[in-house]
Each structure stands twice: as structure tokens, then as C-alpha cells.
Amino acid sequence: MNLKLLSSVAFAATIGFASAAYADITIGVIAPLTGPVAAFGDQVKKGAETAVEVINKAGGIKGEKVVLKFADDAGEPKQGVSAANQIVGDGIKFVVGLVTTGVAVPVSDVLSENGVLMVTPTATGPDLTARGLENVFRTCGRDGQQAEVMADYVLKNMKDKKVAVIHDKGAYGKGLADAFKAAINKGGITEVHYDSVTPGDKDFSALVTKLKSAGAEVVYFGGYHAEGGLLSRQLHDAGMQALVLGGEGLSNTEYWAIGGTNAQGTLFTNAKDATKNPAAKDAIQALKAKNIPAEAFTMNAYAAVEVIKAGIERAGSTDDSAAVAKALHDGKPIETAIGTLTYSETGDLSSPSFDIFKWDDGKIVGLE
């Protein structure tokens, strides 16, 4: 066959494929699909997938089908940047993600530089939005806000208890722990011990000895379920009856699986239970049909897709991320599965809300 003709045919085929692909609105999902926090990444993946299925069944966005492109950050900043570059290289303009603040901050820089809008369902670190990037939004609150909720509870109910504060050295965990520490200090409680653990470590006996010596009755842990579950177990194995507190990093079922009955009574902050909001009805039904629990991160990811949809519809553009960001900053309410959202100029929720939850016999219940 004539090579020139073959090249022409191949080029035409490429153009045809590109046109077909362009007819879809592609949303990238950057999340830890592998690694130590993959359980949270799975929640985000399922929430985004379900939202897209519901949206497409209703006609898509501006009549165009929505498709998802997944990129695994493994909970590691370097891999997150690599995943972001992959998304940028594919010409994608919208992203749901990231899960952890430590990955979200460097990735947001890459996305901002390349005109990609991101909505994170779970990255709560203040540094993410404090830099004033126009393209960054959340469907969750900030660390300081949830830490203050738990601190307020401690100040009202445990002011006579000896409180220790521990973190995992990460942006999320340390930020959460430091915000909690500052809040209880302001309220008149001085921690009896402040320390850290290293992610991946299994033996916390030296730390437990220090906590026991300090007489800690309450241990606030800023970090995720793996280290939190081990710490809870080892505290109780050492004969301590200390109550463990934390943030949404302790909300995954793997926390209970690791800590076992030693995790009984653990208190943690998380977004208000969206399942009690009438606006969540359709999302809950769609998730239930797929046997997916309506967990907080799942619902936040579902809402993140809805936020992108609302921005595209307001901006009237499926590929101008700057126009979409401007539309989301307009202060008008956005109806989502987790309720009505509005955004501040930093991309934070104007009225975030947190509740305190408790691990009770392997189940999460609201604190009465």
C-alpha cells in the first residue's frame, strides 16, 4: 500500500478518534488506589463512579457523557505528581482528588500551573487552600475546624483528665494534632505528653511506656487508621484504659480491624452524617444498589463530581477550567448529596460542619 496514503488514512482515523473522545467530558480521579491509605482511595473511587453513573443516566453534563480517568498516587507525593502529570498530558481539565494533604499540596501546584481544576473530597490540611490557588476546592472542612470540635468536647467533658497528643509526622496528622493541642491549651488544658510515631512502624512500646508513665487518660492521635489502630491495641495491651480520640483518619473499618475490641469507644470527628440529609436520598439509593456503604468519603467524592457538574453548567463551558472556577467562586449555592454548598474565595466551604462519632462494637455511631 502507498505509504503516503496509509499515513493519510491513519491521520484521519486519529482525528476521528480525537473527535469522539472530545464529545465526552473526562474527569480525572487521583487517589491512593494502592498503599497504606488505599481503603480511603477506594471510597473516593466508588463515590465518583456512582455519581457519574447517575449523572449519565440523567443525560450527562450539557448533554455530554462523563467518563472517569483514574490515576493512582499510592499516598506518596512523588507518585502523586507523576499521576498529575499523566492527567495533564491527557488534556483533562477537571480532577476529583486528592485524599491526603501531603500529596494534595504538591499535586495542586502541578494542576494549577496547567489549568486543571481540582475538588478534593478529603484533604483537610489548611496549607492546601491557604496559598490562594484559584483552581482548588473542597467538599470537606479543614483540620483546624474539626480539631476545635473535638477540643471543645474535651474541654466540656474531660477537663479533669490527663490528655496526651500524638501525631504521625504527616501534613494531615501533625496539622490535626497541633490544632487540637492549641485549642485545648487555649481552654486551659496542658497536655501531659506530646510525641509522634513514624508511619509504617509496628512497635509503639517505647511511646506506650511514656504515655503510661505520664498517666495519660485520653490520647488524641493525628493520623490514619493503620498506626491509630496499632496504638489503640498496644495501649490496652499495656493495661491502659486510655480513651483514643482522632479525626476522620480513624473512620475506616480497617481501624477496627486492626485495633479490635481495644478500639471500642474511640471517638473521632468527621463530616456530619450526610445520610440524614434528604438531599442524599438519590445518592444513597444508587450506592445501595451497588452494595456500597454511604460512608463520609464516598459521599464527599460523590458531591465533588456534582460540584464540577454545577461549575461546568454555570460557566457554559466543558473545557475552560478557569471559567468553571470563577463560576464556583460566585457565592451561589450548589445542591449536592451532602447538602447545599457555597465556597469562600479560598475554595473552602463557607459553612463546613463536623460531628463526633464513636466506634461501638465494630460500628460507627453518632455521639449522643
Swiss-Prot record:
Family from the record: Belongs to the leucine-binding protein family.
Pfam (any one): Peripla_BP_6
The UniProt record lists the keyword Signal: yes
Coiled-coil residues: none
Originating organism: Brucella melitensis biotype 1 (strain ATCC 23456 / CCUG 17765 / NCTC 10094 / 16M)
Name of the featured protein: Leu/Ile/Val-binding protein homolog 3
A GO BP entry: amino acid transport
SUPFAM superfamilies (alphabetical): Periplasmic binding protein-like I (SSF53822)
Alphabetic keyword roster: Amino-acid transport, Signal, Transport
